[in-house]
């Protein structure tokens, strides 16, 4: 990411997938700041993450306020609960009430909500806070550049497969012109960074990832892959029932030789297992 020339990033739910120590290391390695207004706590670099950051570009002062989604129950982002133990999260929409004062600062030309909430969350921000000029979003992996009554929204897909070129004219703190362009980074006509390609290939060329560990005679759907995955766990752990969240299974088992890279594609998180005794009457599905 340092090689992409980022100026700033928001913390998203998957930043926590490998634990707080790893995330703290990644933040310290980054040559750009992370922001997130609706969480607190943590150690190391996590304790230093700012709520917002002001960046000056070509004479324009831009305030970036960060926010991450807090899951279906509003308690923590969609990651393993153990990975966010000791951290405290607040409502990512309501937290923007605390930052209205930023728009009153005459030195700020543009207020940007840099979010990992998904499309519906970004829409709520523009519906509720007219001081936000632009929402740069993520999480739901959409691709769009839209104008709403109170501001603008953009999102650029996932995994850096695409970027958004957004061109705006600003006059007296107001966006007077907005143009949005999608740039597909898989386009073969784009110039490639050869040194970066070599670095990526270095990680991909680990022989242990491609060692044969099995064979599948058919292609599996996601549901079938889930059945295979949970049945394998049941056999190894020797239990009666295995419960696995569907979002934790990220790929399908395909026909052919099975290698560790296939398994990591199916289960990239390495969340571990909890084994416990429960009665049928206590099990509520």
Where are these regions (language model features)?
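Acidic, metal/ion-coordinating pockets
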Residues: 1-189, 195, 222-232, 242
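Solvent-exposed loop/linker segments at secondary-structure transitions
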Residues: 170-285
């Amino acid at each position: 990411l340092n090689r992409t020339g980022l100026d700033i990033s928001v913390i998203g739910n998957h930043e926590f997938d490998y634990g707080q120590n790893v995330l703290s290391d990644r933040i310290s390695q980054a040559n750009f700041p992370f922001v997130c207004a609706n969480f607190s706590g943590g150690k190391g670099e996590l304790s230093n993450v700012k709520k917002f950051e002001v960046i000056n570009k070509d004479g324009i002062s831009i305030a970036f306020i960060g926010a991450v989604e807090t899951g279906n129950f509003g308690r923590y982002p969609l990651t393993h609960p153990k990975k966010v133990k000791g951290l405290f999260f607040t409502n990512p929409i309501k937290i923007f009430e605390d930052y209205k004062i930023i728009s009153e600062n005459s030195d700020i030309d543009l207020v940007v909500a840099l979010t990992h909430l998904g499309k519906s969350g970004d829409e709520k921000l523009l519906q509720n806070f007219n001081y936000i000029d632009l929402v740069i979003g993520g999480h739901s992996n959409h691709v769009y550049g839209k104008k709403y009554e109170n501001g603008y929204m953009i999102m650029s897909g996932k995994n850096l497969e695409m970027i958004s070129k957004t061109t705006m004219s600003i006059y007296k703190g107001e966006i007077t012109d907005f143009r949005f362009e999608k740039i597909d980074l898989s386009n073969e006509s784009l110039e490639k960074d050869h040194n970066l390609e070599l670095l990526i290939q270095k990680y991909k060329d680990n022989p242990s990832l491609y060692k044969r560990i099995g064979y599948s005679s058919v292609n599996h759907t996601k549901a079938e892959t889930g059945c295979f995955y949970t049945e394998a766990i049941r056999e190894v752990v020797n239990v009666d029932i295995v419960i696995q969240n569907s979002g934790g299974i990220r790929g399908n088992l395909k026909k052919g030789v099975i290698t560790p890279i296939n398994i990591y594609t199916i289960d990239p998180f390495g969340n571990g297992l909890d084994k416990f005794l429960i009665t049928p009457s206590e099990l509520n599905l």
